[in-house]
Amino acid sequence: MASGKFITFEGIDGAGKTTHLQWFCERLQGRLAAAGRQVVVTREPGGTQLGEKLREILLNQPMDLETEALLMFAARREHLALVIEPALARGDWVVSDRFTDATFAYQGGGRGLPRDKLETLERWVQGGFQPDLTVLFDVAPQVASERRGAVRMPDKFESESDAFFSRTRAEYLRRAEEAPHRFAIVDATRSIPEIRQQLERVLAAL
């Protein structure tokens, strides 16, 4: 575990990924400490001063579908340039709550934006750069909806229908099927202790 790696957490809203991210990062940091490496914890959209401003807009303001995708990738370019790439160059590890798979799942699968348009933006913004590992928290939209209903006021995406999240989930699973070497799928319907057991296996494989 000496060289820097980029890990992403993905899943539909209500899958529980954010609940487990800090625990995962603390466990990972414990394993990296002896090598003098740090774990940089970040998120998308966001992670930078500009990215957080764009996040506030993206999560709360209605907008044209293509504008939404363009702003997502604009925030991502800033995130890569200011946070992710410098951290990896130092040999640190980066764990991000969402990355490009979320754009394909939400703007592509959920919103219906053509995949070729997203692929064009992906090539422009990140070239061939991809996460070393993507942990996908998979859960049925109905279960995720019940979880979302038990928390704070929902943002624009959290307020979407089960049908939207069914399309989003399907796109996540399709991407996982296309890149099985990169994805680790977590059964997010399980209890917190059971999910953490799954994450322990993910950590052991790093």
UniProtKB/Swiss-Prot annotation:
ATP binds at residues 11-18. The keyword Kinase applies. The keyword Nuclease does not apply. Its EC number is 2.7.4.9. InterPro entries: P-loop_NTPase (IPR027417), Thymidylate_kin-like_dom (IPR039430), Thymidylate_kinase (IPR018094). It is an enzyme of class 2 (transferase). One of its GO terms (molecular function) is dTMP kinase activity. Keywords: ATP-binding, Kinase, Nucleotide biosynthesis, Nucleotide-binding, Transferase. One of its GO terms (biological process) is dTTP biosynthetic process. It catalyses: dTMP + ATP = dTDP + ADP. GO terms for cellular component: cytosol. Coiled coil: none annotated. Phosphorylation of dTMP to form dTDP in both de novo and salvage pathways of dTTP synthesis. NCBIfam families: DTMP_kinase. Belongs to the thymidylate kinase family. This is Thymidylate kinase. It comes from Burkholderia cenocepacia (strain HI2424).
